[in-house]
Structures are given as C-alpha cells and as structure tokens.
C-alpha cells in the first residue's frame, strides 16, 4: 500500500510539473551587407541571457568582453556588440562594425531562458571592394 501511494504521488508530481516551451526568435538566419549596421533579434518570450556561440572572421573573437548590470547585459569585441536591455527583454540589439576584410563574418547569437535556448546565425558579407 505504501509503495502504491508513493507511486501515485510521484506520477502526480510528474503530471503537475510545468514544462517550459522553447524560446523562439523571429529570424534564425540573417544575411547583411558589409556596411556598419544594427540588427534587432526579436523573441516571443522574455530573454534571460545572451551569448555568442561562435564566430568565424578574420578577427579573433576570443577577446570578447562580457559585462552587465541590473539594466543591461553587454558582450562586445572588435567587430560586434550584443546588448540585452533588461527593461525590454524581448529583443537583442546586435551592432556590427563595417566589414573591411575580404572574408564574410559569421556570428551565432544564442538567447536563453532558464533551460531552453534558441540561436540565430548572422552573416555579414565581405566588402566587395576591400581597398575602399
């Protein structure tokens, strides 16, 4: 009888658990030209954290600085800046500097909640005339 009771309680706990649905970004692939620009990644749920997963560029991305406060989370390096405004946590601002190299730049941005994540790949095309 005791085992049956424990099994029933365990099953009830499983059925009453809240399962988080995954956060979803509006766009998962964004291709932009070489000019300096800002991109807004919109999400359907509140974003708790941002990160960049990887980058492929002529500039080393391992020198990224991460800092934050109660109002913003910021990640930046030589050619990009990610900003999550905690007062409006449904979007991430991605600021890209002009791509003066002869290679495309690729940046994967990850947004997350407690346990779920979503990613967007941003490709900044190379400068068609790198001598400019």
Predicted features along the sequence, with ranges:
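Post-signal peptide N-terminal segment of mature Sec-exported envelope proteins
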Residues: 26-43
């Amino acid at each position: 009888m005791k085992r049956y009771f424990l099994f029933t309680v365990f099953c009830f706990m499983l059925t009453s658990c809240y399962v988080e649905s995954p956060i979803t970004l509006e766009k998962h692939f964004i291709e932009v030209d070489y000019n300096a620009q800002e991109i807004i990644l919109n999400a359907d749920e509140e974003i708790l954290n941002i990160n960049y997963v990887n980058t492929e560029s002529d500039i080393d991305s391992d020198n990224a600085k991460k800092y934050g406060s109660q109002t913003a989370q910021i990640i930046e390096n030589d050619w990009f800046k990610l900003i999550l405004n905690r007062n409006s946590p449904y979007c991430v601002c991605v600021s890209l500097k002009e791509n003066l190299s002869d290679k495309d730049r690729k940046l994967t941005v990850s947004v997350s909640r407690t346990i779920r994540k979503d990613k967007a790949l941003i490709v900044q095309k190379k400068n068609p005339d790198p001598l400019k």
